[in-house]
Amino acid sequence: MNSWTFQADTLNLDYLQSDEFVKKSAELRGSVMMIGPLLARFGRAVITKPGGDQIGRRRLDTHFLGFQKLGAKFRQVEGRDVYEITAQPSPTTHHPSPTTLKGTYMLLDEASVTGTANIVMAAVLAKGTTTIYNAACEPYLQQLCKMLNRMGARISGIASNLLTIEGVSELHGTEHTILPDMIEVGSFIGMAALVGTGVRIKDVSIDNLGIIPDVFRRMGIKVKEEGDDLFIPQQRHYEIQSFMDGTIMTLADAPWPGLTPDLLSVLITVATQARGSVLFHQKMFESRLFFVDKLIDMGAQIILCDPHRAVVVGHDRKRQLRGGRMSSPDIRAGIALLIAAMSARGTSRIDNIQQIDRGYENIEGRLNALGARITRITAP
């Protein structure tokens, strides 16, 4: 188990203005998550347009509107594509805190996971009470709130869409064990179902997987819960269920506790070898289904109805996908294509694998240990 210790007694805030910081933060969408903690502690943060997956519009309005509700101000730095966010008292005003953030009521325009988390991290040190309605309540958010409470924060309503935060003057250190990545768990369930001869996924924190195991069961996949492990036996055949009225099964993404959109790509790949048909409805992003063209090139029977919907007609393992060369457009499509390649006849080559690396650590090492034959090729 990897353990890390963090201590940040002194930070170089001038680094936020450097070209190096701007360049690095523009390459990583997660850089936006520094705004909340920096505002809470120092009353100042800098942000440029962050990078990340190209899966459609992924606006940051929820973050910024929340910070503005707390009293932060935004200013574009002249001559640079950079915004400075401040919540600092005037130098001529005696203020006991380094920030002027004040608690308030806010109704989020969407239940954004990262938006809620960012606002929570700012609000815990704001003066007064902050109420966040339509808050995200994914396990990721729950564990953040629980960790902050152990650090001295006062957050109630955890696991609901209504969070109440009583601001405190300071936080202290704590120990925290990070939850298993439920998207990685779901990806391995799909992989084991399609190509495995019996795979055990250990220490998955079953209570925090929500409906993920049941969605695979609706696809006809046998998923056994054994303690805190999941065992996926070899699936010689698996049949997609129909609705009770006999109509075609529809699987659609939704905010938690609904089906996470991050698993639709894997589920689509798994469906290509199922018995029966299923309609996938990707509601939350408009470009995430375009990768199915690559599965079609491999021999999958998929009808792309529009940017949000695709019908998969399974082969029932009667026709194997064929290998080919493809490129990973984003993290989740990348792992789905890797799963498809593992099940395909012949050799496949996947380019742009840094997308997969962003979400799956040492993926080829772990899969090769299970019997896969994956070779990483370093480009000249």
Name what the model sees in each region:
Residues 1-380:
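Short, structured segments at the rim of ligand-binding sites
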